[in-house]
């Protein structure tokens, strides 16, 4: 019986290092997903649903018809929820000025980091999903 290949659906060196430290054999394949295209779904899905939807979209982008791999994909959504205002997604700032502005917006407030993880069996289409939410101040 041929062992199943675990595919880490990520371009993150940090996620790859985690699996390496665990001694888990895997191959890394970056998914082709425009994460920002999903921003408008925050109100409908909430942070937890959005994180899972992004992780699943990454797995679906890597799935091959007739494949037999296990696809491990994840996404983290940062969100600032202020009473009386719609939730605000926190993206990677991109510039030093944007970083300062984001840090100022977070100062003295609690924000959430929500992780969605999907393990998709390419052969059956079955998926296991996990969501973790951490509140940070």
Segments predicted by a language model, with ranges:
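N-terminal G-site helix/loop of the GST-like fold
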Residues: 5-30
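Short glycine-rich, Thr/Ser-proximal phosphate-binding strand/loop in the N-terminal lobe
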Residues: 23-45, 128-133
């Amino acid at each position: 019986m041929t062992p199943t290949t675990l595919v880490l659906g990520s371009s993150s060196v940090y996620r790859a290092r985690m699996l390496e430290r665990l001694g888990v054999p895997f191959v890394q394949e970056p998914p082709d997903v425009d994460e920002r295209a999903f921003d408008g779904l925050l109100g409908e899905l909430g942070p937890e649903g959005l994180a899972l939807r992004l992780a699943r979209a990454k797995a679906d982008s890597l799935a091959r018809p007739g494949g037999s791999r296990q696809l491990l994909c994840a996404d983290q959504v940062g969100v600032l929820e202020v009473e009386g205002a719609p939730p605000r997604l926190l993206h990677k700032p991109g510039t030093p000025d944007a970083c300062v502005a984001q840090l100022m917006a977070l100062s003295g407030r609690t924000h959430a980091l929500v992780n969605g993880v999907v393990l998709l069996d390419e052969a059956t289409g079955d998926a296991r999903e996990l969501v973790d939410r951490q509140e940070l101040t």
